Amino acid sequence: MPPKKKKITALIKLQINAGKATPAPPVGPALGQHGVNIMEFCKQYNAATESQTGNVVPVEITVYDDRSFTFVTKTPPAARLILKAAGVDKGSGTPHRVKVAKLTPAQVREIAQTKLPDLNANSIEAAEKIIAGTARSMGITVGE
């Protein structure tokens, strides 16, 4: 007989700094309420993201009824990549009036290529439009 499929009890989405997961909030409480071994998750997550240190890496944790878990790491949030490329700490408080930085089309393309697996875009051009829209909503202009 084939093995029984595990029943999923929870799907947890977190954004954690790469290589710096600790049992402290937000990781501890989110996993603790589902009975997951927090230290085991932290070790596995830190090992999986050690090459991306300095970025925030979203993770989707699937918890099963026997308290085991699997996780999938995503690409860093577009807003973080845009701020890093533009060299600013935060976007504009009034994005359509005050512009805080400028991105070149090459920078937008690079961010779009990084984000392409997680975006619902079929082409790099569509992904670039999504990234450019995000940048504009943060008060960052896109162009030459």
From Swiss-Prot:
GO biological process: translation
Post-translational modification (record): One or more lysine residues are methylated.
Keyword Transmembrane helix recorded: no
GO MF term (any one): large ribosomal subunit rRNA binding
Subunit structure: Part of the ribosomal stalk of the 50S ribosomal subunit. Interacts with L10 and the large rRNA to form the base of the stalk. L10 forms an elongated spine to which L12 dimers bind in a sequential fashion forming a multimeric L10(L12)X complex.
Protein family according to the UniProt entry: Belongs to the universal ribosomal protein uL11 family.
The protein's name: Large ribosomal subunit protein uL11
Lineage: Bacteria, Bacillati, Actinomycetota, Actinomycetes, Frankiales
